[in-house]
């Protein structure tokens, strides 16, 4: 029993040491400072969530601008292998320049969450809070979008619950 305990302690010590080793030092995250992506731009992914898939973390969140809380861009996607260095993967769900669309530029699109559905092999935005353009918080809708193949890329939006994601 003592040999087993010693071996486990040695293994844990080695794992802690080697897991902390890296070719490149990680940049510290400083509270209260702007956190830059791989392009030196501040990460713009508010109210979002992080998912892990095939060795990579993906951060999805609302792109916010300085002048309004309305969605002027959409949902952003960032990827990271270490939770410190983030690559901008682009707009995952874009608002559109069509006032008859539920996701028209100027709508309120908040708190997007994405998961991987192993059964279908698709990445699914399991939901986001959606308010129609110019209606404030009166509509109280939820939105769903899905994508195939990779978590980074454009999500097709499915209004009125027509998504065949499951």
Q: What is each model feature region?
A:
Residues 1-11:
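Bacterial N-terminal signal peptides that target proteins for export
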Residues 8, 21-166:
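Carbohydrate-active catalytic/glycan-binding domains of CAZyme proteins
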Residues 9-19:
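Bacterial N-terminal signal peptides
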């Amino acid at each position: 029993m003592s040999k087993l305990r010693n071996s486990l302690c040695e293994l844990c010590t080695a794992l802690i040491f080697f897991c902390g080793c890296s070719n490149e030092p990680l940049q510290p995250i400083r509270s209260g400072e702007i956190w830059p992506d791989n392009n030196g731009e501040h990460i713009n992914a508010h109210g979002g969530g992080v998912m892990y898939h095939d060795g990579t973390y993906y951060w999805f969140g609302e792109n916010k601008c300085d002048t309004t809380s309305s969605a002027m861009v959409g949902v952003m996607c960032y990827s990271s292998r270490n939770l410190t260095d983030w690559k901008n993967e682009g707009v995952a769900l874009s608002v559109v320049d069509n006032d008859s669309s539920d996701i028209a530029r100027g709508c309120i699109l908040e708190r997007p969450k994405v998961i991987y559905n192993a059964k279908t092999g698709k990445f699914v935005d399991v939901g986001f809070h959606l308010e129609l353009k110019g209606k404030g918080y009166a509509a109280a809708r939820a939105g769903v979008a899905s994508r195939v193949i990779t978590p980074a890329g454009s999500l097709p939006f499915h209004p009125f619950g027509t998504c065949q994601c499951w």
